[in-house]
Regions:
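Conserved motor-region signature of P-loop NTPase helicases/translocases
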Residues: 1-48, 55-58, 175-176, 181, ...
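PLD-like (HKD) phosphodiesterase/transphosphatidyltransferase domain
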Residues: 2-14, 18, 151-197, 274-292, ...
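Basic/charged alpha-beta structural segments of nucleotide/phosphate-handling enzymes
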Residues: 36-176, 190, 217-218, 228, ...
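ATPase/helicase motor core of nucleic-acid motors
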Residues: 52-60, 66-76, 262, 291-302, ...
């Protein structure tokens, strides 16, 4: 039993000290538990362990949260661990039920719910001590009252928060057992750090962090102090830091954040400063750099950015035209997905129509002077958005006809609209079953029907994909829709288990809550090549070991895109009263994150920043430039101007031919390999156009798109939004 702290400079997840402690635990207990920072790292480390004979069997690898959930199943009580969705539902419920006097300066807004949802997992078990401290403002005291009610609600419904779970596990976990080894796990919350420290009194706990020399290692050193306490003794791992293939890169790593005049890095061409003279040539500048590095023998690239989606949209097609494979893990919010928006439109329309149908029960249809009442719901535009989506099971022709008939009837009754939807002969079997599930308040069942329908379609498409060996846009969309609908089902199941019933009045609140949830979708540009480019946020670099890529590009190195993260003022102020434990500064984290990303390069690295007025260098870029002779970046940086337009600014062009202006129409034929990522080519037959736009819009016999009145109104509100929502670019 005891706590062992290690500083390691290799950056490997299986450093010498980690392997030694795993072997010792296996020898004594027959098993060991290794905690790593992310699910991506879990897969990487499992492959590495499989190649080491002594560690190939008996080592369980997981993230901390996964391990905590497993431990709760073994040693926890009958109470259930709370999800983030349910946490927000409970807080919103409590806030809505409080009077204005009880709320004080608090509001019932989404921001208040977010703030409370961040506080509860960490400080709920210490609420009494926080209140007794007597240093809270009126607003903070009101927040504590909400937390107190929340605590009582959890007890009533048999749920536990993270901090309560960890406190319970400290008591119930057996005195003896396999070692718990942490490798490169950064930024553990305060509740988790306390748990690790106290658990070391019952089990062997090893905490190993990557601590590079200089300011980049300050954050890790601070976290080791938080785990072990002030003045704790840390052992130093015997492994040596691996060297990059480029001496210039090694020198830069040794000097960044601690540059001194007269001790500059000697340039050799391994580090490049890209300075496009405008946003239109930014992507061309990056793609050309990748091409040049590929010609020099580089095979693997990472593009670190603060806006992965924007960079992916702009760069993936450019790389595809050059025959370079690109990958990206896309975080899709439910409200940004086609299926999520369509389902939200259905819920919105159903809630409105069901309320209207209740009012219509009191209308005497036979009376000549009967009043229609409020008709602001007519026409049911959100319903049409659902009908033309892939999750309705209704053909585009039928959806278009229904929309046309509803708009042509100014005395339309909501009751008749619902009757139409609930009859399979008039809509579709899927639509009718979905409506009937909603009538029973079973939103999970409604989503499950859609999942079954999409699963059947996906199975058929996958069979076609196996034959054609190509993944179509439609099949990718179905996979995304399946993940989104599964997320909605799991959220609905959580509410059901918590005893919360969904009514037509609460359906909208539920779907609003679901909209902000996200699913992860791995995407690629469809190119098969040994040259691979990963587009990722900087924080993802913690999932990689040093020198994992041949070349690394930092995109958008200005203060706006690559600045030091600002902390939540209200949250920080509350935490200051709730905890006396010192925190790791945001700037120390910034230095650590940049260095961790920088060291993933083995051969070359590029720093890209658009040259424009009133946009300043990011701190990290200024620190890098300080390692070089004065004005070195200006003299040697690669600038791409906009004054001479190049054809290769277009995604599908490859030759750097200079022209006076960009062509207004495409020339030549599109490469067949690229057709899957071209959403709306100019020259299409009726058949191919119908295939491309299936489930989106109607196509006439002449091969022209037909739009319903609802679609035209939506388009006129915001054309750009209309096109992007339908993935037409």
């Amino acid at each position: 039993m005891g706590l062992l702290l290690y500083k390691q400079q290799t950056g490997a997840f299986l450093s010498n000290s980690v392997k030694e402690r795993l072997e010792a635990s296996l020898e004594r207990w027959g098993s060991a538990q290794l905690i790593v920072p992310s699910s991506d790292t879990v897969l990487l480390v499992k492959r590495q362990l499989g190649a080491i004979q002594e560690l190939s069997v008996g080592v369980n690898v997981s993230t901390f949260d996964e391990w905590m959930r497993d431990q709760w199943k073994l040693y926890g009580s009958s109470d259930r661990l709370l999800s983030n969705t349910l946490r927000k539902v409970f807080f919103q419920q409590i806030l809505d039920g409080m009077s204005a006097d009880e709320l004080g300066t608090l509001t019932t807004s989404k921001g208040t719910v977010e703030l409370l949802s961040k506080l509860a997992p960490e400080y709920l078990s210490e609420l009494d001590q926080i209140v007794v401290s007597g240093q809270l403002s009126a607003g903070q005291m009101s927040a504590c009252k909400v937390l107190e009610r929340y605590k009582m609600l959890l007890e009533e419904k048999s749920y536990v928060e993270v901090c309560q779970c960890l406190d319970y596990l400290l008591q119930s976990t057996p005195e003896q057992g396999p070692a718990l080894v942490f490798s490169r796990v950064e930024d553990l919350s305060e509740a988790r750090l306390k748990f690790v420290r106290k658990l070391s009194q019952k089990r062997d706990v090893v905490f190993s962090l990557y601590v590079p020399e200089g300011p980049a290692g300050y954050a890790a050193e601070r976290q080791l102090e938080l785990v072990g306490g002030p003045g704790c003794a840390c052992r130093v791992d015997t492994g040596l830091a691996p060297a990059a293939k480029s001496q210039e890169l090694n020198d830069l790593l040794a000097r960044v954040f601690r540059a001194k005049e007269g001790n500059e890095v000697t340039p050799s061409g391994a580090v490049t400063f890209l300075s496009p003279l405008g946003q239109h040539v930014e992507v061309e500048s990056i793609s050309r750099y990748i091409s040049q590095c590929a010609e020099s023998g580089c095979k693997s690239f990472a593009v670190y950015t603060s806006d992965s989606q924007r960079v992916w949209d702009a760069l993936s097609q450019k790389l595809a035209a050059k025959g370079i494979a690109a990958h990206y893990r896309r975080s899709v919010r439910i409200q940004d997905s086609l299926a999520g928006r369509a389902f939200a439109s259905l819920i919105d329309a159903y809630a409105t129509l069901s309320e209207r149908a209740e009012l219509e029960k009191n209308i005497d249809y036979q009376a000549s002077d009967h009043q229609m009442g409020d008709m602001s719901w007519w026409p049911p535009r959100t319903l049409t958005d659902y009908l033309i989506s892939p999750i309705s099971g209704i053909s585009v022709e039928r959806a278009w006809m229904l929309d046309k008939s509803w708009r042509g009837n100014r005395t339309l009754y909501a009751t008749r609209v619902l009757e139409t939807l609930s009859k399979a002969a008039m809509s579709s079997r899927l639509c009718a079953e979905t409506i009937k599930s909603l009538e029973l308040g079973r939103i999970g069942s409604a989503a499950q029907r859609i999942i079954e329908y999409l699963s059947a379609e996906t199975s058929d498409e996958q069979a076609e994909v196996v034959q054609s060996k190509e993944l179509t846009l439609q099949s990718l969309q179905n996979q995304e829709s399946l993940k989104v609908m599964n997320k909605i089902v799991s959220s609905a199941q959580e509410l059901h288990e918590a005893g919360l019933k969904l009514t037509p009045q609460t359906l909208k609140s539920f779907i609003e809550l679901c909209k902000d949830q996200a699913v992860m979708m791995p995407v690629s540009n469809g190119i098969q090549s040994d040259i691979q480019v990963l587009i990722a946020p900087v924080r993802q670099a913690h999932s990689f070991e040093p020198h994992s890529f041949d070349a690394v590009i930092f995109q958008g190195m200005d203060t706006l895109n690559f600045g030091v993260k600002a902390s939540d003022g209200a949250l920080q102020e509350f935490v200051r009263h709730a905890s006396k434990t010192p925190k790791v500064s945001e700037f120390a984290r910034y230095q650590r994150d940049f260095y961790t990303a920088l060291i993933t390069a083995s051969t070359s690295v590029a720093f890209e920043k658009v040259e424009q007025k009133d946009v300043f260098n990011a701190v990290a870029l200024s620190e890098v430039k300080a390692c070089y002779p004065k004005d070195y970046a200006k003299k040697t940086g690669v600038a791409r101007g906009e004054e001479e337009v190049l054809v290769n600014l277009l995604p599908q062009a490859t030759d750097p031919e200079r022209v006076a202006e960009l062509p207004t129409i495409e020339s030549g034929e599109i490469d067949p390999k690229l057709k899957n990522i071209v959403v709306l080519p100019r020259h299409l037959t009726r058949e191919t156009l119908e295939q491309e736009l299936q489930g989106l819009i109607e196509v006439s016999r002449e091969g022209l798109p037909l739009l319903s009145a609802s679609q035209i109104e939506t388009y006129l509100e915001c054309p750009y939004k209309w096109f992007t929502q339908r993935r037409i670019k």
